[in-house]
């Protein structure tokens, strides 16, 4: 049991790979340590191919263990439960660059499991997990065309930073994760604070250059371990099947891909596919999965050829035209903000809801709890593509698309100081034919403006495709669903008129150069400007008035030492204020008070009462107060909540007063002037000084 270790410097951190000691019954297991963040990544492949051999059954699981951060899980069971949103997103991040590196026809089930075992809060486990998955797949002997490298790139003070610490990322204008092989970029996931396209592209190139260090280290580790390749060979091309499918399907598929309407097109293609499969599988002549795969290849060839050689897309558009856009805002009467964004056959109904501080989402992250004041949820019900299906908790894809849309919108959101509301956006995809996540970005921007949120401009998103054959390539603007999986690169860009806020790329082949990416980003910018123009026609600026049904939040500051007085014994005082005024009140430890109410006057009344409680008595000021109790020598008058002062009998009137009760009774409202506050805090009042 002699572990093999490989160590290298990666940005500011030292990374080590170790294999051979832990999880030895897996096909491969690598322990990755990056500055104290330790991830165990295992790979297991089934030796027999899947009986449903028309797809590659790859599963990626990413799990964070509470012990990694020295914590015991909360909840009744005190153990880890269903995956968090962060775990789901990281699993997708690992999956996306490794999936295209398995060969067509490989249908053995493969499972990659990444387990976070130790956490340095400054080092996100996503990069170590991706590197570990790459190393484990390389060592496993599976037909994996890797290894890949992965890097996080920040942009601070005009310079790129490799694998910045978490505290640096918070102040960075860019948080970009890039993954790729030695020769090609495969995946980009990023969020930016409105940066030019050139800066984004530069970050991708920088990250790809830097990750070569990690790729070399994995190759050296594999050499030292000695990898035994799997005994798998791609099945030989069945020339007779290729010819038969071509003869039976080409004409019908060609007709189908000339139908612009999605549902009519899919119906035609379905009929053609069924007829060909029935004809070629009769009496066991050919394997059904092999026929399906060949039909798919022919479809890909037809669509790609039409685009590359004729500049003709499925719905008849040229390469750079965006589908027709229609926009309506304020579509739902009692929501705080809403928008219906339709682009071709993709439609999103997006709703913005404003809430108070107590509506913030409490995230129990591995590095500790924090509050999320902006949420964006994306729903993709089966009816949006004309299908039936289960409706329930969000799937991985919905979580991923929601996060991408949130990244796109985040940069235009006001701070809590500027707009003290917790905001939740929900994007309901009501129709879908490609780029629904980007429709969600556009709809979210419009819904926020409809709700009266003071955004820093509008943001729009567009999904792009790219087809490359040798030296020829075509960039497609605003791709449809059928174009999505037939291209060599699909990427989504969200941004304002001034720059990019989110960029997501998935690249399936080698040969896509920075120059090609630059042209693609330029074309995406043109499309984005067109969409922003359409949005500006519908709603040029945030509404000046919020919905009548949205809470009004009043924010002001009190002396933190007075918080106890506002809350009262057992919360009695603040409870009385909220119940009597119908408001919601939040007080933070630094004395910031936020009062939320749908009725503006109720909010003002609650504020007045809190200010009265926290106010200091001022010498020389006249107050109206209630006589609290009578004494032989004078009367105590309540001038502020919880603050009484004494009106001495000699200060009640200019006339001689024999008995206090001759002039005053308990409960009387009187005007008094503060004469002095002695060292013990006792307040002397006068009624006659007012007269």
From Swiss-Prot:
HAMAP family: PNPase. It comes from the Bacteria. SMART domains: KH (SM00322), S1 (SM00316). Keywords: Cytoplasm, Magnesium, Metal-binding, Nucleotidyltransferase, RNA-binding, Transferase. It comes from Methylococcus capsulatus (strain ATCC 33009 / NCIMB 11132 / Bath). It catalyses: RNA(n+1) + phosphate = RNA(n) + a ribonucleoside 5'-diphosphate. One of its GO terms (molecular function) is magnesium ion binding. Mg(2+) binds at residues 484, 490. Belongs to the polyribonucleotide nucleotidyltransferase family. Residues 620-688 form the S1 motif domain. Its cofactor is Mg(2+). Residues 551-610 form the KH domain. Involved in mRNA degradation. Catalyzes the phosphorolysis of single-stranded polyribonucleotides processively in the 3'- to 5'-direction. This is Polyribonucleotide nucleotidyltransferase. GO terms for biological process: mRNA catabolic process; RNA processing. Its EC number is 2.7.7.8. It is an enzyme of class 2 (transferase). One of its GO terms (cellular component) is cytosol. Component of the RNA degradosome, which is a multiprotein complex involved in RNA processing and mRNA degradation. InterPro entries: ExoRNase_PH_dom1, ExoRNase_PH_dom2, ExoRNase_PH_dom2_sf, KH_dom, KH_dom_type_1, KH_dom_type_1_sf, NA-bd_OB-fold, PNPase. It is found in: Cytoplasm.
